[in-house]
Amino acid sequence: MLGYNRLGINGRLGNQMFQYAALRGIAAKHNYDWVIPPLDHTTIPMAEYVLFDGFKMSSVKESNFGFIPQDRPTYDEPSHDFDVNLFNNCPDNINLDGFRQSEKYFKHIEDEIREDFTFKDDIYEPCKEFISQYGCLLYTSDAADDT
């Protein structure tokens, strides 16, 4: 079983999306079960665990909520690059940590991840007309902008 005990601590929504997707992708590659912190967890101070606020997260079942025991190893990322060794050789029964900001961790289960990250109806419905009229909008911020 793989877990991400600090989900909600290492960054906000975008980071949590990558961390969740990477956890799911690595677990799927090795046919491992996986867990994420329960929605009502208060064991981690200052956690901003927001994945379930806006997304349906339809593949998450009750059995997917929990923690990896603290006596199990935690694997932190050595850099912000894709960790091919972790992806190909991940041991079972560990806790993942770090940001895991690469789609390579979950590209093979992209459809499942997209389904989980479907907006909840109360968010999507008010935006539906705008989206159909203008299509998908993408906002990017370039820190090296010369303007």
PLM regions with names:
Residues 139-147:
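Single conserved hydrophobic/aromatic residue that forms the stacking wall/gate
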